Curated annotation (Swiss-Prot):
Keyword match Cytoplasm: yes
Record protein name field: Probable actin-related protein 2/3 complex subunit 2
Family as reported in the entry's similarity comment: Belongs to the ARPC2 family.
Gene it is expressed from: Arc-p34
Main subcellular location of this protein, as a coarse class: cytoplasm
Organism domain of life: Eukaryota
Keywords from the UniProt entry: Actin-binding, Cytoplasm, Cytoskeleton
GO BP annotation list: actin filament polymerization; Arp2/3 complex-mediated actin nucleation
InterPro entries for this protein: ARPC2, ARPC2/4
């Protein structure tokens, strides 16, 4: 299985080129690049007011207002500090780098900008991890978080004194995707037996899990719910960053591997079809050719 990168590599590579050219003393060039990411997220890298030495990176998330309710603005201020500027029109967050004042740790700055999407997502997880570590449960100053991270797909997060439960709803666009999704989730459950530190993973098809009872969660033949039960060892200060890195990408991870599995199956089917055609071609009998003569002595060939 392949782990998807949590950063946006195109954003990082674009900014790296800008910094390296500036360090080398090359003339600054204008930039206007739009980059797509998972979950309908868009990045926009551009200059401010035509100043080629000022490079602004903006991010647009359709669900950012929901993240703001869980401390997204505060987390970004903590992570980006003076890099934050007023958001560009049509975007939720913007950061600015000055190519005339390059910091010594510019590579770390590039890395942090590439993690903008991850850090926006992190706010809701950190909030509920803190609730759990403080021994607070639902009804004790907090309620379940509901993040509509994609059209018709939702993430739910709630804390109990002994665990944090994260539920992803997802839509399978094809009947085959449901089958492959079930197989994939079964493999995850089997893999947990080999690792006693892995979180509990549950999958429900058509019906939402009990955690979402009476919430109006969607029901349907193409609806699936993936539930993670995170225990204190997953939400502790020293491990929570890795937990967030892995869990916020899970929906994309699942569908990526479903598509890879379908592509592999199709390639195997095409390979088998090619082999069968070769066998049939070898088994085809050669046509019989008979040479005969007429009464006048002319020769003709008859193919049977």
């Amino acid at each position: 299985m392949i782990l998807l990168e949590i950063n946006n590599r195109i954003v990082e590579e674009t900014l790296t080129v800008k910094f390296k050219n500036a360090i080398a003393g090359n003339k600054a060039e204008s930039i206007d690049v739009t980059v797509a990411d998972f979950d309908g997220v868009l990045f926009h890298i551009s200059n401010i007011n035509g100043d080629k030495t000022k490079v602004r990176t903006s991010i647009s998330l359709k669900f950012y207002k929901q993240l703001q309710e869980h401390g997204a603005d505060e987390l970004l201020k903590r992570e980006y500090g003076d890099l934050l500027v007023a958001p560009e029109d049509g975007y939720n967050v913007s950061v600015l780098v000055d190519l005339e004042n390059i910091p010594e740790n510019w590579e770390e700055t590039v890395r942090k900008i590439g993690l903008l999407k991850r850090n926006c997502f992190a706010s809701v997880f950190e909030k509920y991890f803190d609730f759990q570590s403080q021994g607070e449960g639902e009804g004790e100053g907090q309620k379940r978080a509901v993040i509509n991270y994609r059209n018709d797909e939702t993430m739910y997060v709630e804390a109990k004194p002994d665990r944090v439960t994260v539920v992803f709803s997802t839509i399978f666009r094809d009947e085959d995707d449901v089958v492959l999704g079930k197989v994939f989730m079964q493999e995850l459950r089997e893999g947990r037996r080999a690792s006693h530190t892995a979180p509990q993973v549950l999958f429900s098809h058509r019906e939402p899990p009990l955690e979402l009872a009476n919430t109006g969660a969607r029901v349907g033949e193409n609806i699936g719910y993936v539930t993670f039960v995170l225990f204190p060892r997953h939400t502790a200060k020293e491990t929570r960053d890795n937990t967030i890195n892995l869990i916020h990408m899970f929906r994309d991870y699942l569908h990526y591997h479903i598509k890879c599995s379908k592509a592999y199956i199709h390639s195997r089917m095409r390979a088998k079809t090619t082999e069968f055609l070769k066998v049939l071609n070898r088994a085809r009998p050669e046509p019989k050719i008979t040479e005969k003569k007429t009464i006048t002595g002319r020769t003709f060939i008859r193919k049977e």
